Each structure stands twice: as structure tokens, then as C-alpha cells.
From Swiss-Prot:
One of its GO terms (cellular component) is mitochondrial inner membrane. It is found in: Mitochondrion inner membrane. It is a multi-pass membrane protein. Keywords: Electron transport, Heme, Iron, Membrane, Metal-binding, Mitochondrion, Mitochondrion inner membrane, Respiratory chain, Transmembrane, Transmembrane helix, Transport, Ubiquinone. The keyword Ligase does not apply. Heme 1 (or BL or b562) is low-potential and absorbs at about 562 nm, and heme 2 (or BH or b566) is high-potential and absorbs at about 566 nm. This is Cytochrome b. Belongs to the cytochrome b family. Gene3D superfamilies: Cytochrome Bc1 Complex, Chain C (1.20.810.10). The gene is MT-CYB. The chain crosses the membrane at residues 33-53, 77-98, 113-133, 178-198, 226-246, 288-308, 320-340, 347-367. Heme b b562 binds at H83, H182. SUPFAM superfamilies: a domain/subunit of cytochrome bc1 complex (Ubiquinol-cytochrome c reductase), Transmembrane di-heme cytochromes. The cytochrome bc1 complex contains 11 subunits: 3 respiratory subunits (MT-CYB, CYC1 and UQCRFS1), 2 core proteins (UQCRC1 and UQCRC2) and 6 low-molecular weight proteins (UQCRH/QCR6, UQCRB/QCR7, UQCRQ/QCR8, UQCR10/QCR9, UQCR11/QCR10 and a cleavage product of UQCRFS1). This cytochrome bc1 complex then forms a dimer.
Length: 379
């Protein structure tokens, strides 16, 4: 008689994905971020569900309802801050996860990588719409500025913006639809994450050496299930430290003021996790050019598999590419810093140089470094 987990139709699927899954024996802590993203998504959906029970998506009462959640609902303050900081945590894990994929050449699993890029777009859209819901000053003006970018689309731009707004400005209709989309998108993300996992399990995981590991596989459980559990506990410790001791450290003080269409905040800026893309957007003086650069700053990830010129998969033994990778990471930190600064010298030129460097490293320097390293191997 076979074990139930190997014969039952539903348990069989779980078994193949999380128990008897053959995994490389040498994958490091950088491979923990996939499961940590799953934990983040579960936290966000759970806390979001409870918040939605008390939130009202009306311009007159949205700000008050968030205040009511924090003041009058049992542990409402905790749920609200868990949800707000959970978004930051989600993006921290997401950027580590993408960085791991670039460093170890995981992007060569093209289907998994491309679905990951779609997931990134979905998560960014969800986070943006969620930031609008508390209806504070930065919520309102952030929504106005970002949705206004669509007016740069030739010919249909102005109509497109009014269609998304549901009127002639960001108002009640906009808030209602953003709430509806913000509620449904995480479930679409969860479904897409399953497809992401499905394609990953078609090929099996990559490993730090970037070489086939078929000769040396170990079962996912107990080895990596316990490793992921340890990672999740470390993540939760960090997460709860932020939520309980520094709940507002990643927020904007302007968002504690109710939305006022007649009063513009001195510096309109998105949450920290969008600042790098915002800096790239602002570094181009032309509106349409800026919007294209903004979209390309994420879409450029899809070119990684096409621009892979090295005969090795991982950067483990490629010192020139390693230097470029860490230069790219440093450049993203600079872009994040610039995105939060006002548009004035010397920040303008620094942002423009950092934007040029960002695209140059990915589109030009990485492929050239790969070819040079191939030559060095034969030398």
C-alpha cells in the first residue's frame, strides 16, 4: 500500500512541491527568499482582509476609517502597521530574490524568470494602489502624479487618464476602484506565484555553482523545509521589531494629514521601494521619455536571458561580472537616495548619471564582461 501523501490527488501535488521535491544539496541562504515572499504574501492577504472589514473607500470617510482602525478596533493599530510595513518587507525580499536570480544566473530558466517579472509588475501595481487608500496628502498627490503620467501616451493619453480617474480628477470613483483592484490583485499574485513555482519545478532549482546538480539531489523535507522555517523566524523577528518599535520609519509624515486637493506637499515622492524607478523617471526632461524609461527600468530584466554571453551560468567564478553586479547594486542605492531628494542641482545630474549607468551596466557592460571572461578562460 502506498503512503497517502503519494496517492491522494491533492496531497500528491503538495508532496511533489514541498516534501519529496529533489533539491540541489548546496543551495545557500539566498534561496530562502522565495519561501519568505510566500510568507509575506500570506501576512499581507491576512492583515489586508481584516483591514478591509473596517475600511471605507469613500473620500469623506477613508482617512477617518483608518484612524478608527488604529484607535477603536481591537489591535487595529497592530494590523494596520503590520500591513503597511509588510509591504516594505515584501519589497526587501523581492529585491533580494531578483538580485539572487541575476547573480547566480537563475534568469536562464526563461519561463520562471518572465513570470517573475509579471509578478513584480503586479506587486508594484498593488502596492501603489494600496498607498492611495489611507487618503492622506501623499496618497492623493502620489495618485495624481503617477496616474497623470499616462497622459504622455500619444493621442489617447488625456482620455486614458480621465477613464482611469473616473472623472476629471482623482476623486471618489478613483478611490473606490483602487480599493477594488487592491483587494483582488493579491489573489491574482498568489495564483501567478503558483504558476511561477510550477515552471520552477519543471527544471528544478539552480544552485550557487550554476552547474547541473542531478547527480547530487536531496529531498526538500526535512532539509530545506527546516531551513525555510529558520529563515521565516528570522524574517518575523526583524518584521516585528520594525512593526512594534519603529512602525513609522518607512512612512511619510505628510500622509498623517488628510488629502487636500488645494494644498500640494513640498516634495511629492512615492514609498522608498519605488524611489529608484522614480529617480529614473525624473532624470529625463521629456514626459513621454521619462515614462518609457520608467517602464524600461523594470522591463530591462526580461533582456537578461538574451544578453547572457558567458559560458558560465553563475557569477561565482567571474570576477569582472561580480564587480559590475555590485556596481549595479550601489547604483540602485544612489538612485533610491536621489528619488527622495528635491529636483535641484547637484541631485539632477547625479540622478541622470546614475540612470545612464543603470542601463549601461545591464545592456552593455554585462555582455562585454561575459565575452572577456570567456577569453580569459582560454588564455
Amino acid at each position: 500500500m502506498t503512503i497517502l501523501r503519494k496517492s491522494h490527488p491533492i496531497m500528491k501535488m503538495i508532496n511533489h512541491a514541498f516534501i519529496d521535491l529533489p533539491a540541489p544539496s548546496n543551495i545557500s541562504g539566498w534561496w530562502n527568499f522565495g519561501s519568505l515572499l510566500g510568507v509575506c504574501l500570506i501576512i499581507q492577504i491576512s492583515t489586508g482582509l481584516f483591514l478591509s472589514m473596517h475600511y471605507t473607500s469613500d473620500t469623506m470617510t477613508a482617512f477617518s476609517s483608518v484612524s478608527h482602525i488604529c484607535r477603536d478596533v481591537n489591535y487595529g493599530w497592530l494590523i494596520r502597521y503590520m500591513h503597511a510595513n509588510g509591504a516594505s518587507l515584501f519589497f526587501i525580499c523581492l529585491y533580494f530574490h531578483i538580485g539572487r536570480g541575476i547573480y547566480y544566473g537563475s534568469y536562464l530558466y526563461k519561463e520562471t524568470w518572465n513570470i517573475g517579472i509579471i509578478l513584480l509588475f503586479l506587486v508594484m501595481a498593488t502596492a501603489f494602489m494600496g498607498y492611495v487608500l489611507p487618503w492622506g496628502q501623499m496618497s492623493f498627490w502620489g495618485a495624481t502624479v503617477i496616474t497623470n503620467l499616462l497622459s504622455a501616451v500619444p493621442y489617447i493619453g488625456p482620455d486614458l487618464v480621465e477613464w482611469i480617474w473616473g472623472g476629471f480628477s482623482v476623486d471618489k470613483a478613483t478611490l473606490s476602484r483602487f480599493f477594488a483592484f487592491h483587494f483582488i490583485l493579491p489573489f491574482i499574485i498568489a495564483a501567478m506565484a503558483m504558476v511561477h513555482l510550477l515552471f520552477l519545478h519543471e527544471t528544478g532549482s539552480n544552485n550557487p555553482l550554476g552547474i547541473p546538480s542531478d547527480a547530487d539531489k536531496i529531498p526538500f523535507h526535512p532539509y530545506y523545509s527546516y531551513k525555510d522555517l529558520l529563515g521565516a523566524l528570522m524574517l518575523l523577528a526583524f518584521y516585528l521589531t520594525i512593526v512594534l518599535f519603529f512602525p513609522d520609519c518607512m512612512g511619510d509624515p505628510d500622509n498623517y494629514m488628510p488629502a487636500n486637493p488645494l494644498n500640494t506637499p513640498p516634495h511629492i515622492k512615492p514609498e522608498w521601494y519605488f524611489l529608484f524607478a522614480y529617480a529614473i523617471l525624473r532624470s529625463i526632461p521629456n514626459k513621454l521619455g521619462g515614462v518609457i524609461a520608467l517602464i524600461l527600468s523594470i522591463l530591462v530584466l526580461a533582456l537578461f536571458p538574451l544578453l547572457h554571453t558567458s559560458s558560465q551560468r553563475s557569477l561565482m567564478f567571474r570576477p569582472i561580472s561580480q564587480v559590475l553586479f555590485w556596481l549595479l547594486v550601489s547604483d540602485l542605492f544612489i538612485l533610491t537616495w536621489i528619488g527622495g531628494q528635491p529636483v535641484e542641482p547637484p541631485f539632477i545630474i547625479i540622478g541622470q548619471l546614475a540612470s545612464i549607468l543603470y542601463f549601461s551596466i545591464i545592456l552593455v557592460l554585462f555582455p562585454i564582461a561575459g565575452l572577456i571572461e570567456n577569453k580569459l578562460l582560454k588564455w
